């Protein structure tokens, strides 16, 4: 009898709990639905107000000429003379540039819910990579006119939920392809031109709209001919791009204009954030493998075959030179902190590790890597090759036939951090860039004491020099230290 009573009580208790659970889930679903509705209402309200301002808030702003990228008179490489050895000495420095702290990417002001309505699929290409987005059924986006009213109406049309799938698909591509902010902006440009036509006002406002809805700071302007132009705000100072001074800072112009300025709608969007030029992770473009290149050190200790993704190089061609704040030497950290792609690591690193197995210590491994970078690559000035200064990402040095001191130092710093797990800093002298490595055991040679750590100079452009040797004529010059991430 007691057992029967226990069973009945248990059943009743289970039924009660089950009913409570159902009620909770029902209430939660209703709450979730209401919250989503509130989000959508908020976003539509914001876009409606934004469009209303677009009908009236356009003012003339004069263009600010581009800041030219720094031109450093780089010193030529020097051949090491064993007979000119000197006592180890500290490197004098007067500034330490801190390591970067990349922030999370911007996000929409409200979740973008998938629209279950009818749609059509559009495909496009960006950096050799296929993209696919959903557009409204029978998509035909046109701006009826070239004035403030027409542009505001176009913004209102885009902000209907018919275009929510497009925004979602673009954000999914950003996530799946691990696109940095600049790559995402370029992708949106390719998408917009594919569906609206190259150089059209429709393509410009579509790119601006999706970038804005993704959480980024944008401004729209138009020329004297009423052609739309997109302006973007950056965390960093960008060289070689003209800009416009808005209420919250400088915005950069991506498309050329013949006029001395633009009529700009300087209206902010809630929670908007500037784009960043940090590349925190590999950009996963479709792979287009380059021709094989052999890279052999002069003493034959290290010999490898190298191939890179040409689609990635195509993206790097678009990447603008920039600096953090107003510190011109910070620009090299942007390149040195960018990781090598997985495919390059899978091909190159096993070969390098196999060669370094013969080394008797970590210090000797670093020395062999140094000699490889010193002698396997051909030195040439950027002015002669590119007609302007151009720093390389590590992959570019592995691909292009020539490189200079900054490219070698960027590559060497990447290899030492990845293969040997050691901390590396960049050392900038006037006209020259080198590296310094923090070994776990004391190493003889020129050094930098920094934050309680001992860094030994390793110069990839001092040809034939072992670790610990500073290139001649650098000794008495004040250096700047650039801290790097892992």
Which residues are covered by each model-predicted region?
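Sec-dependent N-terminal signal peptides
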Residues: 4-13
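Sec/Tat signal peptide C-region and signal peptidase I cleavage site
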Residues: 15-19
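Long, contiguous, compositionally biased segments that the model treats as domain-scale units
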Residues: 29-32, 36-210, 214
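Sec/Tat-exported extracytoplasmic proteins
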Residues: 35, 39, 43-46, 50, ...
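Secondary-structure boundary elements
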Residues: 134-137, 145-187, 333-399, 461
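Extended, non-transmembrane interaction/recognition domains
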Residues: 192, 198, 202, 206-357
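Active-site neighborhood of thiol-dependent amide/isopeptide-bond enzymes
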Residues: 194-207, 380-440
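Hydrophobic/aromatic-rich core segments of domains that either
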Residues: 218-247, 357-360, 407-486
């Amino acid at each position: 009898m007691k057992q029967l009573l226990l069973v009945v009580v248990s059943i009743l208790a289970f039924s009660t709990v089950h009913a409570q659970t159902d009620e909770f889930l029902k209430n939660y679903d209703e709450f979730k639905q209401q919250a989503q509705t509130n989000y959508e209402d908020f976003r539509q309200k914001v876009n409606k107000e934004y469009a209303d301002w677009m009908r009236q808030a356009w003012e003339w702003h004069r263009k600010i000429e581009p800041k030219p990228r720094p031109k450093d008179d780089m010193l030529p490489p020097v051949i090491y003379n064993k007979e000119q050895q000197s006592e180890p000495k500290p490197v004098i420095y007067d500034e330490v540039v801190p390591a970067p702290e990349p922030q999370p990417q911007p996000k929409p002001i409200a979740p973008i819910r998938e629209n279950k309505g009818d749609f059509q699929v559009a495909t496009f290409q960006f950096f050799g990579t296929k993209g696919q987005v959903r557009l409204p059924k029978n998509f035909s986006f046109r701006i009826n006119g070239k004035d403030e009213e027409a542009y505001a109406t176009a913004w209102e049309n885009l902000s209907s939920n018919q275009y929510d799938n497009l925004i979602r698909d673009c954000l999914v591509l950003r996530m799946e392809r691990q696109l940095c902010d600049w790559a995402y902006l370029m992708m949106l440009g390719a998408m917009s031109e594919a569906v609206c036509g190259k150089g059209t006002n429709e393509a410009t406002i579509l790119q601006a709209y999706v970038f804005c809805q993704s959480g980024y700071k944008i401004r729209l302007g138009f020329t004297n001919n009423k052609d739309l132009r997109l302006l973007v705000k950056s965390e960093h100072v960008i060289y070689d791009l003209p800009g416009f001074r808005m209420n919250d800072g400088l915005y950069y112009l991506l498309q050329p204009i013949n006029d001395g300025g633009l009529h700009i709608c300087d209206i902010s969007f809630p929670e908007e954030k500037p784009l960043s030029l940090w590349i925190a992770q590999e950009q996963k473009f479709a792979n287009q493998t380059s021709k094989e290149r052999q890279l052999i050190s002069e003493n034959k200790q290290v010999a490898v075959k190298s191939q890179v993704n040409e689609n990635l190089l195509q993206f790097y061609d678009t990447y603008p030179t920039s600096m953090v704040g107003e510190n011109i030497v910070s620009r090299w950290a942007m390149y040195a902190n960018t990781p090598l792609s997985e495919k390059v690591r899978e091909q190159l690193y096993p070969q390098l590790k196999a060669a370094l197995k013969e080394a008797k210590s970590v210090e000797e491994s670093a020395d062999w890597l140094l000699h490889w970078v010193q002698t396997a690559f051909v030195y040439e000035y950027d002015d002669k090759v590119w007609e302007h200064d151009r720093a390389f990402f590590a992959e570019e040095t592995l691909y292009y036939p020539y490189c200079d001191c900054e490219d070698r130092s960027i590559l060497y710093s990447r290899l030492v951090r990845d293969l040997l797990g050691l901390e590396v800093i960049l050392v900038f002298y006037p006209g020259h860039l080198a590296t310094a490595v923090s070994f776990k055991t004391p190493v003889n040679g020129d050094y930098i004491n920094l934050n309680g750590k001992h860094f030994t100079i390793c110069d990839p452009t001092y040809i034939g020099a072992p670790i610990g040797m500073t290139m001649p004529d650098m000794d008495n010059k004040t250096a700047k230290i650039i801290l790097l991430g892992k």
